[in-house]
UniProtKB/Swiss-Prot annotation:
Keywords: Ribonucleoprotein, Ribosomal protein, RNA-binding, rRNA-binding. GO terms for cellular component: ribonucleoprotein complex; ribosome. NCBIfam families: PRK14548.1, uL23_arch. Part of the 50S ribosomal subunit. Contacts protein L29. This is Large ribosomal subunit protein uL23. One of its GO terms (molecular function) is structural constituent of ribosome.
Length: 86
């Protein structure tokens, strides 16, 4: 795994906040060349959380968006708040 940060930005739309609250899921934008395994490893190491699942999609704008579901031991809203994003 590269030591470079792979998260381009966090998505903080109404839908993303709702997913964080109800499904404990972070929504992030990553480079298109990054795969699910790399995303999972990076999020676990960088934020010291346990990742259960990673789902990805390519948006109509050509960005790769990843939905990263955290274990119940970790709280997505709390993580976003600690990062100063909420």
């Amino acid at each position: 795994m590269s030591t470079q940060p792979i998260i381009t930005r966090f998505v903080l739309t109404e839908k993303a906040i709702r997913l964080a609250e109800k499904e404990n899921t972070l929504t992030i934008v990553v480079p298109r060349s990054v795969n699910k395994k790399v995303i999972k490893d990076y999020v676990e190491k960088a934020y010291k959380v346990k990742v259960i699942d990673v789902r990805t999609l390519i948006t109509m704008e050509g960005e790769k968006k990843a939905y990263v579901r955290l274990s119940s031991e970790n709280n997505a809203i709390e993580l976003l708040t600690n990062l100063g994003l909420l």
